[in-house]
């Protein structure tokens, strides 16, 4: 899948403003309204994996003799447009903007409140 995306002529990687470890809220889909921490970002597909959200069950057959099969639950990816950064202090969602501070360091902040993230 990733190789086929890279081979396309006009393929461009989408910049993601959400990073691993951010707290996000789902704004669209069956899990709408739930919040969780981003475990993994997949920039080439513009997707994120959020802890405890969009769970899928996977049935695993026994591989060795004497072993029993299992049912695993794991998080599936969500499209990045379906999640939004969530601020615990202000209890609201907001878009993220980049800015350069006085020392010349690039940082992120919330557009609604101006709260600096990192």
Swiss-Prot record:
GO terms for cellular component: ribonucleoprotein complex; ribosome. One of its GO terms (molecular function) is structural constituent of ribosome. One of its GO terms (biological process) is translation. CDD domains: KOW_RPL26. SMART domains: KOW. Keywords: Ribonucleoprotein, Ribosomal protein, RNA-binding, rRNA-binding. Part of the 50S ribosomal subunit. PANTHER family: MITOCHONDRIAL RIBOSOMAL PROTEIN L24. Belongs to the universal ribosomal protein uL24 family. One of two assembly initiator proteins, it binds directly to the 5'-end of the 23S rRNA, where it nucleates assembly of the 50S subunit. This is Large ribosomal subunit protein uL24. It comes from Prochlorococcus marinus (strain MIT 9215).
């Amino acid at each position: 899948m990733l190789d086929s995306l890279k081979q396309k002529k006009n393929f461009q990687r989408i910049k993601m403003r959400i990073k691993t470890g951010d707290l996000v809220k789902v704004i669209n889909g069956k899990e709408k309204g739930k919040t969780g921490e981003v475990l993994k970002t997949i920039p080439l597909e513009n997707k994120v994996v959020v802890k405890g959200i969009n769970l899928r069950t996977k049935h695993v057959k026994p591989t060795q003799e004497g072993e029993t099969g299992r049912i695993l639950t794991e998080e599936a990816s969500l499209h990045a447009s379906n999640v939004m950064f969530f601020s615990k202090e202000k209890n609201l969602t907001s878009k993220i903007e980049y800015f350069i501070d006085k020392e010349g360091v690039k940082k992120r902040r919330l557009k609604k409140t101006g709260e600096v993230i990192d």
